[in-house]
């Protein structure tokens, strides 16, 4: 009998899939649940076993997710249209583990629960095909044409326990929590407050916090002088910044498949870390570096969001980002209050910024040199403007009234 490995979340879709695959495709079903900061892992594992999955794998990947995926995104200020890529970053890691576990048990098929309207189907399937072209991907949600009410009825008929009180579709990992659902689709209404779980709404956030974040080579390594693993540092900041109302993102998103989607993200740690990292970059990179890096950051976000983590171009992008971040080290002091972040200090040994050079009372910068610079700098504009007689005549012939 053929085997299929299901990326299992414990929700309605993937729970129904276990029975559906067994019943309609006559396959043995194994499940893989990746721990990247999810909750209720024990309950998910028990549920998979109860539904007849065998074997059932739960893989703790929080540290790997932080160090191999989030770290690269931090260096690239990873943001797609203002969204810190939390879900998008996790999908290629899940695809990698799915391929490895499927190969380990001799499964010919990998199954995921993404719909035909979203981005995740692209992210999973492009990565799986790149990693193992012989692996086949099954997507029952696209094939069985069941609406939610049909899935609920199927679950009841087959003795599958499901929670029916969930208003939203939620995906979470340590880098962020994403929420979508019918109550968010009417953009004529405000976002219901029951959406928020990680972040206290700014208008209700009374907690104020000040802290120092130290970066080493572009990666945060310390909070207030205490060294921390990246995953632990992120979890700590999620709680602290969230209590100050930091990290709410009400987002209208352009999906890969061409649809627009209204989603809400809660990304406290990602918001704080990216803000501090950008500020540190502004103190260290010169203008040419900053301009090129800004374009590279956008390319990184576009490729990650679009499911192209395993495209060879990412090797070049990540290598460039690592080079730009080589000297991004220092300490940033941030105050967080009512959803707003304030930079209250910066320290480091690689800063190009110098108060002595910019100070108006300083003699360190010879202002007399500016005249020659302006003459040379403006040559192209002056000559190209004056080669057009019509433009010169229009300016010279215009009158000014006093």
From Swiss-Prot:
Keyword ATP-binding: yes
EC annotation from Swiss-Prot or TrEMBL: 6.3.4.5
SUPFAM superfamilies, per the entry: Adenine nucleotide alpha hydrolases-like (SSF52402), Argininosuccinate synthetase, C-terminal domain (SSF69864)
Enzyme class: ligase
GO cellular component: cytoplasm
Binding, ATP: 7-15, 113
Signal sequence coordinates: none
Localization in the cell: Cytoplasm
Positions annotated to bind L-aspartate: 115, 119-120
InterPro entries assigned to the protein according to its UniProt record, in alphabetical order: Arginosuc_syn_C (IPR048268), Arginosuc_syn_N (IPR048267), Arginosuc_synth (IPR001518), Arginosuc_synth_CS (IPR018223), Arginosuc_synth_type_1_subfam (IPR023434), AS_cat/multimer_dom_body (IPR024074), Rossmann-like_a/b/a_fold (IPR014729)
Highest rank taxon of the organism: Archaea
Pathway: Amino-acid biosynthesis; L-arginine biosynthesis; L-arginine from L-ornithine and carbamoyl phosphate: step 2/3
Catalytic activity as recorded in UniProt: L-citrulline + L-aspartate + ATP = 2-(N(omega)-L-arginino)succinate + AMP + diphosphate + H(+)
One record GO biological process: L-arginine biosynthetic process
Keywords noted in UniProt: Amino-acid biosynthesis, Arginine biosynthesis, ATP-binding, Cytoplasm, Ligase, Nucleotide-binding
Family the entry assigns: Belongs to the argininosuccinate synthase family. Type 1 subfamily.
HAMAP family the UniProt entry points to: Arg_succ_synth_type1 (MF_00005)
Complex formation: Homotetramer.
Protein name as annotated: Argininosuccinate synthase
Source species: Thermoplasma acidophilum (strain ATCC 25905 / DSM 1728 / JCM 9062 / NBRC 15155 / AMRC-C165)
């Amino acid at each position: 009998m053929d085997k299929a490995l299901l990326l299992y979340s414990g929700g309605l879709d993937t729970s129904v899939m276990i029975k559906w695959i067994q019943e309609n495709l006559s396959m043995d079903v194994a499940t893989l649940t990746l721990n990247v900061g999810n909750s209720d892992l024990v309950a998910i594992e028990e549920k998979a076993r109860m539904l007849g999955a065998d074997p059932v794998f739960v893989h703790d990947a929080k540290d790997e997710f932080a160090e191999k995926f989030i770290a690269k995104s931090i260096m690239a200020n990873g943001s797609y249209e203002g969204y810190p890529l939390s879900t998008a970053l996790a999908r290629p890691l899940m695809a990698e583990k799915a391929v490895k576990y499927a190969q380990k048990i001799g499964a010919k098929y990998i199954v995921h629960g993404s719909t035909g309207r979203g981005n995740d189907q692209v992210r999973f399937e492009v990565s799986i095909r790149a990693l193992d072209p012989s692996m086949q991907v099954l997507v029952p949600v696209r094939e069985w044409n069941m609406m939610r009410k049909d899935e609920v009825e199927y679950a009841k008929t087959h003795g599958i326990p499901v929670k029916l009180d969930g208003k939203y579709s939620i995906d979470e990992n340590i880098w962020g929590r994403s929420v979508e659902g019918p109550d968010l689709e009417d953009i004529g209404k405000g976002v219901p407050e029951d959406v928020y779980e990680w972040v206290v709404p700014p208008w209700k956030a009374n907690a104020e916090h000040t802290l120092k974040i130290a970066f080493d080579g572009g990666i945060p390594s310390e909070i207030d002088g205490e060294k921390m693993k990246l995953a632990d540092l992120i979890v700590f900041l999620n709680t602290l910044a969230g209590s100050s109302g930091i990290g709410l993102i009400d987002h209208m998103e352009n999906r890969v498949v061409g649809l627009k989607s209204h989603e809400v993200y809660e990304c406290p740690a990602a918001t704080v870390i990216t803000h501090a990292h950008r500020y540190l970059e502004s103190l260290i990179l010169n203008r040419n570096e900053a301009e090129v890096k800004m374009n590279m950051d956008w390319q990184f976000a576009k490729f990650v969001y679009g499911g192209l983590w395993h495209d060879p171009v990412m090797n070049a992008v990540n290598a460039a980002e690592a080079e730009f971040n080589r000297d991004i080290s220092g300490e940033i002091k941030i105050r967080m209050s009512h959803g707003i972040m304030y930079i209250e200090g910066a320290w480091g040994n690689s800063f190009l910024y110098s108060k002595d050079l910019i100070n108006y009372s300083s003699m360190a910068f010879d202002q007399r040199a500016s005249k020659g610079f302006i003459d040379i700098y403006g040559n192209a504009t002056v000559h190209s403007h004056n080669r057009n007689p019509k433009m010169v005549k229009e300016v010279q012939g215009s009158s000014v009234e006093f």
